[in-house]
C-alpha cells in the first residue's frame, strides 16, 4: 500500500460490473433459469438478453421506465423473441435468486476494499440493483462488513444518475444534502457505467473514475476525471 497523503478519503463504489463481474453472474443465472424449463442456453441467446437488459436499465436511468417495468419488460421481450412459453414473473424470481448467489469477485476487489478500510478510507456502495439481490451479494461475499454504508436506489426511491440520489448519500455521509466544494472534493465515485456512475458523479459535482471494461469506449465523449482498466489502479489515483 502506498504511503503518501490521500487525495480522496471517501469512495463510492458501484457493485455490478465494477466490484463484481456482473456479466458472468448474468450468464450463469440466465442459463440456470433456461435449463429449469428444459431449454439449453446458447451464447447468442445470452448475448441477446444482455443487450435487452442493458437497454431497459438505461431507460430507467433516463426516467423513461419504472423499476417494475424494467424487471418484467426485459424478460417479456427476451422470452417473446425466442417464443419461450413460461410464467414471466416466476422466471424473473428464479433469475433474481440466481443473481444473488452467483457472485464473481472482480480484480480481487474484496481484498482491495479491506485494505483501503484498514488505511482509513470510508467506502460506500451506490447501486441501482434490486434490494434483495444486492443485500444477498453483500452478505454472502462479506462486502457488507467492509463498507461503511449502502445506498440502493429502490430504498432511496430514485436511481443513479439523478442528483437527488446523491443528495441522500451526502446527507448520511456529511449530514447535509448540499455539502460545500471542500467536502465534495474528498469524494470519488468508481463505476463501469458511463450513463449511471459517471453521469451520476457529474450530476453530484464529484470526481469520477471510470472502470472501463474491455471493448468499451467513451463514445459520448463524457468528461471523466480518471479512467482505469484494473481496480488496483485506483491506488495510484488515491495516493497521487
Feature roles, as predicted:
Residues 4-107:
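N-terminal helical cap/lid subdomain that shapes the substrate entry/recognition surface
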Residues 39, 121, 206:
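Short glycine/serine/threonine/alanine-rich loop segments
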Residues 24-28, 107-111, 136, 163-164:
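Generic recognition of short, well-ordered alpha-helical segments
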Residues 90-92, 98-104, 109-141, 149-153:
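Substrate-recognition element of Asp-dependent hydrolases with the DxDx(T/V) motif
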Residues 82, 119-120, 204:
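Helix C-cap/helix->beta junction micro-motif
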Residues 61, 127, 189:
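Short glycine/serine/threonine-biased micro-segments
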Residues 1-11, 114, 130-240:
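Asp-based, Mg2+/Mn2+-dependent phosphohydrolase catalytic module
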Amino acid at each position: 500500500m502506498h504511503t503518501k497523503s490521500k487525495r480522496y478519503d471517501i469512495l463510492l463504489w458501484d457493485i455490478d460490473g465494477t466490484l463484481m463481474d456482473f456479466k458472468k453472474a448474468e450468464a450463469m443465472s440466465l442459463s440456470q433459469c433456461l435449463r429449469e424449463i428444459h431449454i439449453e442456453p446458447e451464447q447468442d441467446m445470452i448475448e441477446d438478453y444482455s443487450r435487452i437488459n442493458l437497454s431497459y436499465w438505461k431507460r430507467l436511468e433516463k426516467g423513461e421506465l419504472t423499476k417494475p417495468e424494467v424487471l418484467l419488460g426485459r424478460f417479456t421481450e427476451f422470452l417473446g423473441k425466442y417464443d419461450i412459453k413460461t410464467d414471466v414473473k416466476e422466471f424473473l424470481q428464479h433469475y433474481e435468486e440466481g443473481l444473488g448467489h452467483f457472485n464473481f469477485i472482480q480484480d480481487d476487489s474484496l481484498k482491495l476494499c479491506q485494505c483501503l478500510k484498514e488505511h482509513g478510507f470510508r467506502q460506500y456502495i451506490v447501486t441501482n440493483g434490486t434490494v434483495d439481490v444486492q443485500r444477498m451479494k453483500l452478505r454472502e461475499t462479506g462486502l457488507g462488513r467492509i463498507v461503511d454504508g449502502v445506498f440502493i436506489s429502490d430504498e432511496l426511491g430514485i436511481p443513479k444518475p439523478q442528483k437527488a440520489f446523491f443528495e441522500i448519500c451526502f446527507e448520511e455521509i456529511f449530514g447535509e444534502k448540499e455539502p460545500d466544494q471542500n467536502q465534495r472534493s474528498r469524494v470519488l465515485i468508481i463505476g463501469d457505467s458511463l450513463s449511471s456512475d459517471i453521469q451520476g458523479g457529474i450530476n453530484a459535482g464529484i470526481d469520477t473514475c471510470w472502470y472501463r471494461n474491455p471493448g468499451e469506449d467513451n463514445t459520448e465523449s463524457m468528461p471523466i476525471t480518471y479512467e482505469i482498466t484494473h481496480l488496483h489502479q485506483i491506488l495510484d489515483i488515491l495516493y497521487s
